[in-house]
């Protein structure tokens, strides 16, 4: 008997079989229900980390399970190839970003293969390949022609380390999301996408995403930030009025000052003639203010010395510059109501500005602002109105005076998509002095990113390459310049899920195959980290709608179901090289095998929770794999000298084994199909393996039961530990590979029990558990329960009020 489990040998055999038989290559098949499972594709950083292993193990189990359900399953993989890290690594190693990226792809592809993931490698894409990005250049032109892409001078987030512009979503607490550098504000010409045109649909579409975590939907809803309020004009003497936006027009009568951004045109004009104002403006430039940091910074301001006019009372209202007002949000001006806003209250107290209370007369504001809604007073004609009444009446008054209007605002702003770096998709635009902005003709696509042999400076190399940017205008034929900005890498990752469906089409961005795979809500299961909630996931939803409106796809949303997996921790912290707490998957695979690594990563915690790495835990699941191996090998040895009979005429021990087997199958089928609780699936299979290891009877019926049980064990374990199960299934003499086997069915007759366990409570507290025959009636259950010595000690000397029996489950004795 061969009892030695050789992971490397077994896994190599299985992987060779899958590759030679193209086990995971799929095409469209209308006779089957499709299932599209996708994990967020990796950035080719050099090697896989345990977070990758967890993400892709989850996706692979789901894919293999759905394949066993008879569905036409597609699970593709690719590479998010462009981006700053490649430039930084190339700079450090004095190589080209292309060389660094493609070498990493080769290495990581080998790592993924060794983990046994069931990918359709024929669909592999790399976003840095011109065959991929030519189509986003084509889409860019189509969107430009629809005015959904435009260029304007704008104040942007400038990362001084990475030397590029960042989108608002890429600034975290005032710092660059990759470099962690303090972000500066610059005014430069940039390309934008009108994501705000889709703001309402992006919000309302969230209500239809029943398969998404509520946390992600809430984050997106808050980021889009829809609000309904009033835009109010505060006139100025002999000058343009100042527009402010407010969601609390009920407080308008309590305005005692206005604050404007240090970048507001009024502030900049005042600074020309007032050195103190200019000094304050200069000070504001040194402070990194974001929507997130405004809550914590020291609030500072300066009185401009000029006033505006209250639109209803006509009173003079002083104008201040404050360091907490952002020019990029709203109008860059805010009406201040210190009696009813915490920040305004603190600012007014600090600078001795008047405070006028206009809501809830009986509540004191001596120590704090009163921010709740209530009944107006001290508000002239609006006295006695509640919030809704005041909103409508004040809106009507302002509209009649042409000094205000109802308005819907969004926190979401148009997406700045141009980057001042080399390693990205070139923007297909030509700048001509005569013709202005001209699109690159479709026949000239793709605009290919020129290769460089080495990389030795921060910034965009193509700005220094006249052979790239010097061109002729396709309209007038005169000298012109190719755009040297490249696209934000989120542009590439926003539509890759659709390109997988027809990667081999060189004539169209997408074809009819996209509608086959994206039918019924899009990708059936998407897997990735929650950190992508308001970046990639929002942009992908936006792009899906763009592709729909171009007529490529019919679905409104890209991802029907979303699973956000937890992080992999070690010593209580997220694994990172800087902390020195990383675990190399390659070393673990070499030592224990891929199945052991997969098993542990799925067993240690439910998919959505954080997972603590444990060497002892890894050893434990490795022992389990060895136990499964020995179990099947022992059966094979017994089968050499003992025949297998039929499944009938069972004794008690045989019934118990079948009961345990089919109870386990029922439980894990539920956990695999509905809840993805792979940790409980594995725990149940471990218990089943232990049970089967103790059942060694070799009678014909017992051999049939053992065969049935180990078939169920291997089939249900195969999505999780596919190499081992492939090998053992073949060893058992099965002709068809286990990857092509269906998921087993529960034999309900095996679940019929002669006895049942009943929980017994006294006044709702658990006191014992009793076994009864399944044919016993309630009267017998009550009599036997009341006579049980574990119960009589709780009922002795007391009056039994009633006995409640829940059939097959529980008895509750109520006493007093």
UniProtKB/Swiss-Prot annotation:
Short sequence motif 'HIGH' region: positions: 42-52
Reaction catalysed by this enzyme: tRNA(Leu) + L-leucine + ATP = L-leucyl-tRNA(Leu) + AMP + diphosphate
InterPro entries the UniProt entry points to: aa-tRNA-synth_I_CS, aa-tRNA-synth_Ia, Leu-tRNA-ligase, Leu_tRNA-synth_edit, M/V/L/I-tRNA-synth_anticd-bd, Methionyl/Leucyl_tRNA_Synth, Rossmann-like_a/b/a_fold, tRNAsynth_Ia_anticodon-bd
MF terms (GO), sorted A to Z: aminoacyl-tRNA deacylase activity; ATP binding; leucine-tRNA ligase activity
Subcellular location: Cytoplasm
Keyword set includes Transcription: no
NCBIfam families: leuS_bact (TIGR00396)
Name of the protein this chain belongs to: Leucine--tRNA ligase
